[in-house]
């Protein structure tokens, strides 16, 4: 035993001489949930200083514009599959006609830059499950659409670097297209506003692996600075699921910033809070960002003309910033990829 111990010490000595470092994380994985306050403040500083960002809602739903079978559908346009109760197989056919040939990442990011925005967040995968990037884990993505050969997430990531804008990616926890999930209604009623889509028995682990693989793509292939989650409300997604995902993401890119919807938002404050279409009227004890639409819908809705004035937007920005928050202001390009003039 003594001989083995001496040999081991000699091995460590030789490794040190050659500059070889044993990977500490292989034995003691970092718990990013318990980072020091000093490290947290340093990581979050650019975000706190940013004050103003652009949200972009874009997907297959953009081609419908809030209208299905010739009828205007109430509610947010990006929820039309739920509110119009469109069967998954029928909705998936939109990929064959979705042709946003006018989508111009450079112009969108330039618009953000000229407005004084410091970061941009794009819906890489909304609840519908369609992916705006070429993902190796699904065919329900841009590579299977009429604009195959383009990758809007890569185009936006590149443009953000060009203009000095931080790049963020929205990713929905639920997925109306993925086979692991099914509508939890009787087949006659709408899914309902919150779309409590059910997880099929025994399929959750498979879907979480799918999520992690796609998130890894967004980090490693597109160098996202922010991961902006949504749909944490479903029963099958737990606080512990969110904490595990948070640690996984930070292990891939320790400097990344993640919103509180990665877990149960009411119980989780890291890295920043996300009030929606409202904002607190006093300073908070945590980092926060309020997201607002320019009209009423997030995704493009052709019959939604209730646009906020420039004065309204400036007033909100000043109120939010005065209380230590950021404003994430949304635009929704139409089905051709064109940004409505009212948003400009």
Pin down the residues of each PLM region.
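Mature catalytic domains of secreted/periplasmic carbohydrate-active enzymes
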Residues: 27-344
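Bacterial Sec-dependent N-terminal signal peptides
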Residues: 1-29
């Amino acid at each position: 035993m003594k001989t083995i111990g001496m040999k081991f010490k000699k091995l460590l000595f030789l490794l040190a001489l050659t500059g070889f470092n044993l990977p500490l994380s292989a034995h003691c994985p970092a718990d990013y949930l318990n980072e020091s306050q000093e490290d947290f403040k340093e990581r979050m500083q650019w975000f706190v200083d940013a004050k103003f960002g652009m949200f972009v809602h874009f997907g297959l739903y953009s081609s419908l514009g809030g209208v299905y079978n010739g009828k205007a559908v109430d509610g947010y346009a990006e929820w039309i599959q739920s509110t119009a109760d469109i069967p998954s197989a029928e909705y998936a056919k939109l990929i064959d006609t979705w042709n946003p040939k006018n989508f111009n990442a450079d112009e969108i990011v330039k618009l953000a830059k000229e407005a004084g925005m410091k970061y941009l967040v794009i819906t890489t995968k909304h609840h519908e499950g369609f992916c705006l990037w070429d993902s190796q884990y699904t065919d329900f993505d841009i590579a299977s659409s009429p604009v195959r050969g383009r990758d809007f997430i890569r185009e936006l990531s590149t443009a953000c670097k060009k203009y000095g804008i931080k790049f963020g990616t929205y990713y929905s926890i639920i997925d109306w297209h993925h086979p692991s999930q099914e509508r939890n209604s009787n087949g006659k009623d709408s899914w309902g506003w919150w779309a409590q889509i059910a997880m099929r028995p025994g399929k959750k682990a498979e879907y979480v692996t799918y999520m992690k693989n796609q998130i890894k793509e967004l980090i490693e292939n597109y160098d996202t600075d922010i991961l902006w989650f949504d749909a944490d409300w479903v029963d099958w997604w737990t606080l512990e699921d969110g904490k595990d995902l948070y640690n996984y993401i930070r292990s891939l890119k320790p400097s990344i910033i993640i919103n509180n919807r990665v877990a149960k938002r009411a119980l989780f404050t890291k890295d920043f809070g996300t009030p929606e279409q409202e904002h607190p009227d006093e300073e908070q004890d945590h980092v926060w960002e309020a997201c607002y639409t320019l009209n009423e819908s997030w995704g493009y809705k052709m019959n939604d003309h209730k646009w906020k004035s420039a004065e309204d937007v400036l007033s909100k920005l000043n109120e939010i910033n005065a209380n230590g928050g950021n404003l994430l202001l949304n635009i929704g390009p139409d089905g051709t990829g064109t940004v409505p003039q009212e948003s400009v």
